Amino acid sequence: MKKNLCIAFFLIFLNGLNAQPPNGCEQKITSKILIVGDSWGQFMFLYKGYKEALRQYGFADITELGGATTIIGAQTGTWTRGLGKKNLRAQLLMHPEIEDVVLMLGGNDFVWDYDYGDPIEVLDNSIARTNLGMDTVVNIIREIRPDVRIILPSYDYPNFIDPLIDLPLNPYFDSWESFGFPNPYEANTSMQYIEAKREAWSLTHPNIIFVQNLGLMQYHFGQKDSLPDTSPLGYFYPRLPPYAPKTVPFPFGNQMYPTPQKAMGLLGFDAYHLGPAGFQVFAANHIKKVLLDKLRGYPTETILSDSLNDGWVNSVGEFGTGEIKIGKDRMLKEHKGILSFSTKNIPDDAIITGISIFITRKKIEGNNPLKSVFPNNAKIDIMNGPINGLLPEAEDFSVRMDMEDVGCFVGQANRNNYSTRIDLQSDAFSFLNKTGITQFRISYNSTIQNTASLVKYYNGGAIDEEPLAAHMDIHYELPQQEKVKQAPNNENCAVFPLPAKNEINLRTTKEIEKVSITDVLGRQLSFYGLETENKKIDLGNFSKGLMVLRIYYKDGTIEEKKIIKS
């Protein structure tokens, strides 16, 4: 009862936290993600975890749905009968724009069947029963929308230690007590067993993608303080030292530690659920591993900007390379950013169908210029070739470009490491230099008067596990005889198993000359020479997640396949 009252009060507070919709050229927001689930799904939706993570990656015009399809305490049966089933069907029918369904569901079906002291294997029958319910949920979704992908994220570890060990009045204390006061190692190894069962179930369904999140919060947040050593009940827990972010392995983390309290909900007093920051990290993990490639439209080519030639120029004739500076500094000098891309490898006969540029905020001086009348105050100009020379020069500030004001800016980049996406209009495509360098100039006409509003962005040399580097996605088609074939059921090549663990097999009806594997940003990971019809490719050295396999046939055709390493 304590727990339900606490959650109910908190949800009333959360319902008032609705951010203003982001602006875009058409100020149009599309709901491409549907969350179906229990309390994890409901908190994810109420905290707008996906919405905020999508802003982080430059997709402020995309958001999630879930108000009618997430309920605290929900089980699989909630969505397979009665009002829950009706709501699920209605959302799928009313929103044809949905492309991915996230199932944050299943835990409530079996977790309460566990009695302290029993081996974890006693849950096998309950998990099997839960999987039958999950089968029914999937069938309901497939009946209406057979085309959508279904994402099954794991949960992450609980934290009974920090919020409960000194506060027996916590609404989750009864749950901890009913499980026999398990320490983090006991709770975490049980979670690993359960999630392995859930992952195995996901592999029995086509087009379901399991995303492992165990240990994610440990990896991202670290443990700031050492853990307590005793509880009021005399329960002993060894004091463990703090650790810095990104120093434990991911996935799975350190089994001796709980999820850090900083990631937990209810201001750190929740033992099970994440808070706003935690759910944003949770959503960002799914976006990077599963959604980002689709949101970017599977670009034909991705080019990092040339960090040596990237830079800035300002209104008093100063200029420099390195950071990309845009806006007004503290002396009210206006800065314009210069981006340089080597586009010489784009085929001469390529028919360009789309170009998007992503720039990521590194830091800010003063106010955010994009918060005023964005996007009307943001402008990008294009030059076929260098503006003057390859490096920024004073004249670059005012020189006439080949075409000006050619892009739609999406995303205000209201935090460091947030990206703004710039979609170029089709009139600008003809100015892409297919034999050399294409340069861009970006400026902000901030309405913030007499104060600094300077944004500094990463250039193309920023290397990190996050996509921080300035880059350009190019979509193009080739004449029919060279056109890349992307039909998912193309009979020329079969790739199996998918998802894959350590290797994939290729079986083709045509002779292969070579294959390449790229990551979701289009960066080449490896090249292989292949000459026979049946081949194996070792994925052991690649990180888990989505990759693109490109197959080059000896007849000159090319085929692409999306592959997932789990």
Regions found by a protein language model. Name each.
Residues I364-I437:
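Beta-strand-rich interaction/scaffold domains
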Residues E334-H335, I346-S356:
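Extended extracellular/luminal ectodomain segments enriched in beta-structured repeat modules
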Residues P488-F496, A500-S566:
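C-terminal outer-membrane/trafficking sorting elements
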Residues N4-F13:
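Sec-dependent N-terminal signal peptides
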Residues F341, I351-I364, M472:
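A short beta-strand element within beta-rich, extracytoplasmic domains
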Residues G297-K344, N445-Q449, N459-E477:
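Flexible, small-residue-rich N-terminal segments that precede or flank a structured functional core
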Residues K85-G265, F269:
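Alpha-helical cap/lid subdomain in secreted, periplasmic
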Residues T30-V36, W40-A128:
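Conserved SGNH/GDSL esterase-like catalytic core that processes O-acyl groups on lipids
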